[in-house]
Amino acid sequence: MAKEFSRTQRVAQEMQKEIAIIIQREVKDPRIGMATVSGVEVSRDLAYAKVFVTFLNDNEPEQVKTALKALQDASGFIRTLVGKAMRLRVVPALTFSYDNSLVEGMRMSNLVTNVVRNDTERRSVTGEDQED
């Protein structure tokens, strides 16, 4: 019977849960604020993990940069706690990256909404002109 998920995918899912809990409960750095772990990619040999995060108030790029620096500084602490929680022989080295897919998704949604609104307004204006 074939496995539905590979070991790296299972480790990545579990790491995402654990890192989210650790950032929320254990990391006390005020520079981080409200961080959400949106995904984790683990290398095949489980030596490296890229952690994608978003922040609640990520309007300013400087705040995002500061928060990422704080997370990277705390990566050793987070890695230790992940190792204890997951009981892995090799705990991946953590690298934190900003995940802008949520912001890009909202931007694209706004663009589509504006285009639909403009199209509707254009149709209503041209429809009124044809009736007269």
Curated annotation (Swiss-Prot):
Gene that specifies this protein: rbfA
UniProt subunit comment: Monomer. Binds 30S ribosomal subunits, but not 50S ribosomal subunits or 70S ribosomes.
Protein name: Ribosome-binding factor A
Function in brief: One of several proteins that assist in the late maturation steps of the functional core of the 30S ribosomal subunit. Associates with free 30S ribosomal subunits (but not with 30S subunits that are part of 70S ribosomes or polysomes). Required for efficient processing of 16S rRNA. May interact with the 5'-terminal helix region of 16S rRNA.
Gene3D superfamilies to which the protein is assigned, alphabetical: 3.30.300.20
Entries under InterPro entries matching the protein: KH_dom-like_a/b, RbfA, RbfA_dom_sf, Ribosome-bd_factorA_CS
Lineage: superkingdom: Bacteria
CC terms in the record's Gene Ontology section: cytosol
Keywords per UniProt: Cytoplasm, Ribosome biogenesis
Stored PANTHER family: RIBOSOME-BINDING FACTOR A, CHLOROPLASTIC-RELATED (PTHR33515:SF1)
Residue ranges the record marks as coiled coil: none
